[in-house]
A protein has these predicted regions:
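Compositionally biased, intrinsically disordered low-complexity segments
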Residues: 12-13, 29, 67-72
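A short, exposed loop/beta-hairpin motif centered on an aromatic-Gly-Thr core
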Residues: 24-33
């Protein structure tokens, strides 16, 4: 079985944890970090049933950078 390395981010939003895959922009959520990642894994498995892993955008060394957004 082949494998692909994917970059993911998890954060708490209200009562839930949100998980986001940076390579595909697919997200999921759960009551814990582990549950959010497990649900993301399931969503990615469904996604890759119809899409080639080569379609995943390559993300190397992602960095979280703060940005102040000004709006009216």
């Amino acid at each position: 079985m082949k494998k692909i390395d994917l970059e993911n981010v998890v954060w708490k939003e209200g009562k839930h944890y949100v998980s986001l895959n940076l390579n595909t922009n697919i997200s999921s959520f759960g009551n814990t970090k582990n549950e959010a990642l497990k649900c993301l894994q399931e969503a990615l498995e469904l996604y890759f049933e119809d899409t080639s892993p080569s379609k995943a955008q390559k993300v190397e060394q992602p960095d979280i950078v703060p940005l102040v957004f000004r709006y009216a």
